[in-house]
Amino acid sequence: QFWLRRARRLFPALYAVLLAVAVWAALAGTAEQQSQLRRDMVWSIFYVNNWGQILGDVPYFAGEAPLLRHLWSLAVEEQWYLLWPLVFVALLRIRAPRHVVGGAIIAGAFVVFAYMFWMHSRTPTPLGGPPAAFEGVDRTNFLYLSTITRAGGLLLGAGAAFLWRPWRWTHAPDAPVGRVLDPVGAAAVAMLGCAASVAVLTEGYVYQWLLPLVSILSLVAVMVAVHPAAVGFRRIMSWTPLVEMGKRSYGLYLWSWPIFVIVDATTGSVSNFVWAMILTVAVSEASYRYLETPV
Protein backbone atom coordinates (compact mmCIF):
# COMPACT_ATOMS: atom_id res chain seq x y z
CA GLN A 1 0.00 0.00 0.00
CA PHE A 2 2.85 2.38 0.78
CA TRP A 3 4.46 1.84 -2.62
CA LEU A 4 1.11 2.21 -4.41
CA ARG A 5 0.40 5.50 -2.62
CA ARG A 6 3.85 6.79 -3.52
CA ALA A 7 3.35 5.81 -7.16
CA ARG A 8 -0.02 7.57 -7.32
CA ARG A 9 1.48 10.69 -5.78
CA LEU A 10 4.71 10.86 -7.77
CA PHE A 11 4.34 9.20 -11.16
CA PRO A 12 1.62 11.27 -12.94
CA ALA A 13 3.31 14.67 -12.52
CA LEU A 14 6.77 13.31 -13.31
CA TYR A 15 5.68 11.62 -16.51
CA ALA A 16 3.78 14.74 -17.56
CA VAL A 17 7.03 16.71 -17.22
CA LEU A 18 8.97 14.09 -19.17
CA LEU A 19 6.39 14.16 -21.97
CA ALA A 20 6.34 17.96 -22.13
CA VAL A 21 10.13 18.20 -22.18
CA ALA A 22 10.40 15.51 -24.86
CA VAL A 23 7.90 17.32 -27.11
CA TRP A 24 9.63 20.68 -26.66
CA ALA A 25 13.08 19.19 -27.32
CA ALA A 26 11.86 17.46 -30.48
CA LEU A 27 10.33 20.68 -31.82
CA ALA A 28 12.68 23.42 -30.61
CA GLY A 29 15.60 21.92 -28.70
CA THR A 30 19.23 22.14 -29.75
CA ALA A 31 21.06 19.09 -31.04
CA GLU A 32 22.93 18.83 -27.74
CA GLN A 33 19.70 19.01 -25.74
CA GLN A 34 18.14 16.30 -27.88
CA SER A 35 21.19 14.10 -27.45
CA GLN A 36 21.21 14.63 -23.68
CA LEU A 37 17.50 13.93 -23.47
CA ARG A 38 17.76 10.61 -25.30
CA ARG A 39 20.24 9.52 -22.67
CA ASP A 40 18.56 11.05 -19.63
CA MET A 41 14.98 10.04 -20.41
CA VAL A 42 15.40 6.34 -19.62
CA TRP A 43 17.34 7.06 -16.43
CA SER A 44 14.59 9.46 -15.34
CA ILE A 45 11.68 7.15 -16.12
CA PHE A 46 13.10 4.52 -13.80
CA TYR A 47 14.20 6.97 -11.08
CA VAL A 48 17.93 6.39 -11.44
CA ASN A 49 18.77 9.77 -12.95
CA ASN A 50 21.42 10.41 -10.30
CA TRP A 51 23.36 7.29 -11.28
CA GLY A 52 22.95 8.14 -14.95
CA GLN A 53 24.66 11.48 -14.35
CA ILE A 54 27.38 9.91 -12.20
CA LEU A 55 28.24 6.97 -14.46
CA GLY A 56 27.74 9.00 -17.65
CA ASP A 57 30.21 11.61 -16.35
CA VAL A 58 27.69 14.42 -16.85
CA PRO A 59 29.24 17.41 -15.02
CA TYR A 60 26.56 18.72 -12.67
CA PHE A 61 28.19 22.09 -12.10
CA ALA A 62 29.55 22.82 -15.58
CA GLY A 63 28.59 22.74 -19.24
CA GLU A 64 25.16 23.25 -20.82
CA ALA A 65 22.47 22.47 -18.27
CA PRO A 66 20.55 19.27 -19.15
CA LEU A 67 16.77 19.67 -19.12
CA LEU A 68 16.34 16.84 -16.62
CA ARG A 69 19.35 17.56 -14.42
CA HIS A 70 17.22 18.27 -11.35
CA LEU A 71 15.62 14.81 -11.30
CA TRP A 72 18.63 13.37 -9.48
CA SER A 73 17.05 14.25 -6.12
CA LEU A 74 13.77 12.52 -6.98
CA ALA A 75 15.81 9.46 -7.94
CA VAL A 76 17.45 9.42 -4.50
CA GLU A 77 14.03 9.86 -2.90
CA GLU A 78 12.41 7.03 -4.85
CA GLN A 79 15.32 4.67 -4.22
CA TRP A 80 14.88 5.39 -0.51
CA TYR A 81 11.15 4.71 -0.78
CA LEU A 82 11.95 1.38 -2.40
CA LEU A 83 14.61 0.20 0.03
CA TRP A 84 13.74 1.71 3.39
CA PRO A 85 10.41 -0.13 3.94
CA LEU A 86 12.25 -3.44 3.51
CA VAL A 87 14.91 -2.38 6.02
CA PHE A 88 12.21 -1.08 8.37
CA VAL A 89 10.33 -4.40 8.37
CA ALA A 90 13.59 -6.25 9.01
CA LEU A 91 14.37 -3.95 11.95
CA LEU A 92 10.94 -4.55 13.47
CA ARG A 93 11.55 -8.28 13.40
CA ILE A 94 14.69 -7.87 15.49
CA ARG A 95 12.45 -6.78 18.40
CA ALA A 96 15.17 -4.60 19.87
CA PRO A 97 14.16 -1.58 22.00
CA ARG A 98 13.24 1.54 20.03
CA HIS A 99 16.12 3.55 21.45
CA VAL A 100 18.61 0.87 20.39
CA VAL A 101 17.27 0.71 16.83
CA GLY A 102 17.05 4.49 16.54
CA GLY A 103 20.53 4.96 17.95
CA ALA A 104 21.97 2.40 15.53
CA ILE A 105 20.33 4.12 12.56
CA ILE A 106 21.65 7.53 13.62
CA ALA A 107 25.10 6.00 14.07
CA GLY A 108 24.80 4.76 10.48
CA ALA A 109 24.07 8.32 9.37
CA PHE A 110 27.28 9.56 10.96
CA VAL A 111 29.19 6.71 9.30
CA VAL A 112 27.94 8.09 5.97
CA PHE A 113 29.00 11.61 6.95
CA ALA A 114 32.45 10.32 7.90
CA TYR A 115 32.66 8.48 4.57
CA MET A 116 31.91 11.73 2.72
CA PHE A 117 34.62 13.53 4.65
CA TRP A 118 37.12 10.74 3.97
CA MET A 119 36.22 10.47 0.31
CA HIS A 120 36.68 14.17 -0.33
CA SER A 121 39.88 14.36 1.71
CA ARG A 122 41.62 11.14 0.68
CA THR A 123 40.38 9.88 -2.67
CA PRO A 124 41.50 11.14 -6.09
CA THR A 125 39.31 12.73 -8.71
CA PRO A 126 38.34 11.14 -10.96
CA LEU A 127 37.75 8.12 -8.76
CA GLY A 128 39.81 5.01 -9.34
CA GLY A 129 37.30 2.42 -8.04
CA PRO A 130 36.50 -0.09 -6.66
CA PRO A 131 33.93 -0.96 -7.80
CA ALA A 132 34.96 -0.95 -11.43
CA ALA A 133 31.84 1.01 -12.39
CA PHE A 134 33.21 4.01 -10.47
CA GLU A 135 36.47 4.05 -12.44
CA GLY A 136 36.90 7.56 -13.85
CA VAL A 137 33.83 8.97 -12.07
CA ASP A 138 34.08 12.62 -11.02
CA ARG A 139 34.42 12.78 -7.24
CA THR A 140 32.28 15.90 -6.75
CA ASN A 141 29.52 14.43 -8.92
CA PHE A 142 29.55 11.27 -6.82
CA LEU A 143 29.54 13.12 -3.51
CA TYR A 144 26.69 15.41 -4.51
CA LEU A 145 24.46 13.03 -6.47
CA SER A 146 24.89 9.49 -5.19
CA THR A 147 22.35 7.67 -3.07
CA ILE A 148 25.21 6.39 -0.93
CA THR A 149 26.39 9.82 0.18
CA ARG A 150 22.86 11.24 0.41
CA ALA A 151 21.74 8.41 2.70
CA GLY A 152 23.17 10.22 5.73
CA GLY A 153 20.38 12.76 6.01
CA LEU A 154 17.72 10.15 5.30
CA LEU A 155 19.07 7.82 7.98
CA LEU A 156 19.24 10.71 10.43
CA GLY A 157 15.53 11.37 10.03
CA ALA A 158 14.61 7.69 10.13
CA GLY A 159 16.57 7.17 13.34
CA ALA A 160 15.01 10.22 14.97
CA ALA A 161 11.54 8.84 14.17
CA PHE A 162 12.30 5.95 16.52
CA LEU A 163 13.48 8.24 19.31
CA TRP A 164 11.62 11.56 19.15
CA ARG A 165 7.99 11.17 20.26
CA PRO A 166 7.24 14.38 22.19
CA TRP A 167 3.45 14.08 21.81
CA ARG A 168 3.70 11.13 24.21
CA TRP A 169 5.57 13.17 26.78
CA THR A 170 3.49 16.33 26.88
CA HIS A 171 0.29 17.68 25.39
CA ALA A 172 0.54 21.04 27.11
CA PRO A 173 0.95 23.84 24.54
CA ASP A 174 2.12 26.22 27.26
CA ALA A 175 4.86 23.96 28.61
CA PRO A 176 7.98 25.94 29.61
CA VAL A 177 10.09 23.94 27.16
CA GLY A 178 8.31 25.80 24.37
CA ARG A 179 10.20 28.98 25.29
CA VAL A 180 13.39 27.11 24.46
CA LEU A 181 12.15 25.19 21.43
CA ASP A 182 10.72 28.16 19.52
CA PRO A 183 14.03 30.05 19.19
CA VAL A 184 15.88 26.79 18.50
CA GLY A 185 13.56 26.03 15.57
CA ALA A 186 13.82 29.59 14.27
CA ALA A 187 17.61 29.51 14.52
CA ALA A 188 17.75 26.21 12.62
CA VAL A 189 15.66 27.64 9.77
CA ALA A 190 17.73 30.84 9.69
CA MET A 191 20.97 28.87 9.52
CA LEU A 192 19.56 26.73 6.71
CA GLY A 193 18.74 29.91 4.80
CA CYS A 194 22.28 31.20 5.31
CA ALA A 195 23.77 27.89 4.16
CA ALA A 196 21.64 27.91 1.01
CA SER A 197 22.63 31.51 0.27
CA VAL A 198 26.39 31.31 0.65
CA ALA A 199 27.37 27.71 -0.17
CA VAL A 200 29.53 27.13 -3.24
CA LEU A 201 28.70 23.53 -4.10
CA THR A 202 32.01 22.78 -5.78
CA GLU A 203 34.01 23.64 -2.66
CA GLY A 204 35.35 20.93 -0.38
CA TYR A 205 33.82 22.26 2.83
CA VAL A 206 30.35 21.45 1.45
CA TYR A 207 31.07 17.73 1.56
CA GLN A 208 33.33 17.73 4.58
CA TRP A 209 30.91 19.41 6.98
CA LEU A 210 28.22 21.62 5.40
CA LEU A 211 25.93 18.91 3.98
CA PRO A 212 25.98 16.99 7.28
CA LEU A 213 25.25 20.26 9.10
CA VAL A 214 22.32 20.98 6.77
CA SER A 215 20.93 17.51 7.51
CA ILE A 216 21.23 18.09 11.26
CA LEU A 217 19.64 21.55 11.09
CA SER A 218 16.77 20.20 8.98
CA LEU A 219 16.19 17.47 11.53
CA VAL A 220 16.21 20.00 14.38
CA ALA A 221 13.59 22.11 12.59
CA VAL A 222 11.33 19.08 12.07
CA MET A 223 11.79 17.89 15.66
CA VAL A 224 10.76 21.29 16.98
CA ALA A 225 7.82 21.54 14.57
CA VAL A 226 6.25 18.31 15.83
CA HIS A 227 6.64 19.18 19.53
CA PRO A 228 3.29 20.22 21.09
CA ALA A 229 4.97 22.90 23.22
CA ALA A 230 6.61 24.73 20.29
CA VAL A 231 3.51 26.83 19.72
CA GLY A 232 5.20 29.84 18.15
CA PHE A 233 7.32 27.86 15.72
CA ARG A 234 4.39 25.60 14.81
CA ARG A 235 2.24 28.66 14.12
CA ILE A 236 4.85 30.07 11.75
CA MET A 237 5.28 26.76 9.95
CA SER A 238 1.47 26.46 9.69
CA TRP A 239 1.07 29.88 8.03
CA THR A 240 -1.37 29.34 5.17
CA PRO A 241 0.87 30.60 2.34
CA LEU A 242 3.65 28.25 3.47
CA VAL A 243 1.23 25.33 3.73
CA GLU A 244 -0.18 25.99 0.26
CA MET A 245 3.31 26.33 -1.18
CA GLY A 246 4.25 23.04 0.47
CA LYS A 247 1.28 21.30 -1.15
CA ARG A 248 2.52 22.48 -4.54
CA SER A 249 6.23 22.03 -3.86
CA TYR A 250 6.49 18.78 -5.84
CA GLY A 251 5.13 20.38 -8.99
CA LEU A 252 7.15 23.54 -8.44
CA TYR A 253 10.32 21.47 -8.24
CA LEU A 254 9.47 19.31 -11.25
CA TRP A 255 8.58 22.14 -13.62
CA SER A 256 10.91 24.92 -12.49
CA TRP A 257 14.22 23.67 -13.87
CA PRO A 258 13.15 22.73 -17.43
CA ILE A 259 11.17 25.97 -17.69
CA PHE A 260 14.16 28.03 -16.52
CA VAL A 261 16.39 26.29 -19.09
CA ILE A 262 13.87 26.70 -21.92
CA VAL A 263 13.25 30.39 -21.13
CA ASP A 264 17.02 30.89 -20.72
CA ALA A 265 16.55 32.24 -17.20
CA THR A 266 19.77 30.72 -15.84
CA THR A 267 22.05 33.33 -17.45
CA GLY A 268 21.23 36.30 -15.19
CA SER A 269 18.53 37.98 -17.30
CA VAL A 270 16.00 39.59 -14.93
CA SER A 271 13.18 39.64 -17.49
CA ASN A 272 13.72 35.99 -18.39
CA PHE A 273 13.80 35.10 -14.70
CA VAL A 274 10.47 36.84 -14.10
CA TRP A 275 8.86 35.07 -17.07
CA ALA A 276 10.24 31.74 -15.88
CA MET A 277 8.82 32.31 -12.39
CA ILE A 278 5.39 33.21 -13.76
CA LEU A 279 5.33 30.16 -16.04
CA THR A 280 6.55 27.87 -13.28
CA VAL A 281 3.86 28.99 -10.84
CA ALA A 282 1.12 28.76 -13.47
CA VAL A 283 2.09 25.33 -14.77
CA SER A 284 2.68 23.97 -11.26
CA GLU A 285 -0.74 25.19 -10.15
CA ALA A 286 -2.36 23.48 -13.13
CA SER A 287 -0.43 20.31 -12.37
CA TYR A 288 -1.55 20.39 -8.73
CA ARG A 289 -5.22 21.03 -9.48
CA TYR A 290 -5.80 18.91 -12.55
CA LEU A 291 -3.22 16.13 -12.32
CA GLU A 292 -1.79 15.58 -8.85
CA THR A 293 -4.87 16.18 -6.68
CA PRO A 294 -7.39 14.16 -8.73
CA VAL A 295 -5.07 11.16 -8.85
Question: Where are the predicted features?
Answer:
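Membrane-interface helix/loop caps of multi-pass membrane proteins
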Residues: 1-295
